[in-house]
């Protein structure tokens, strides 16, 4: 299961008028509990900055690649930022959530491609071919409906983006 968020021209104050979206995909053993916190074990892929043309509001079909250009059909690779001694993941990354929280970890998508096809019925077929942390290959497929949420009207560019709360912290 998964969903996409639309943030509009999120980087317009930096001169980039392209639209920005995010994508969050989950393996089947992860679910939301009564408090809307993520529970279970599995993988949780987050891609925060996926760029599309100014006329696109849904995640368009096409071939995407990791690049720092902000051009349509690119996404930002994953990075870890330190802010007040707190690690903050950004860009494209994946949580590996294990039953033993000490074994859970984050891996960053440092390179790769993503191919998106959309059927006439609105079914998204997403093929990922990523390199994690500069060495490990990750290939995966998502095929399902993909709800899109419009965050453009409610999220000023200076605000943080929406993420699901994890039941246990992952370092």
Enumerate the language-model features and the residues they cover.
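A short, structured loop/turn motif at beta-sheet edges
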Residues: 116-124
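Edge beta-strand at a domain terminus
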Residues: 111-114, 127-171
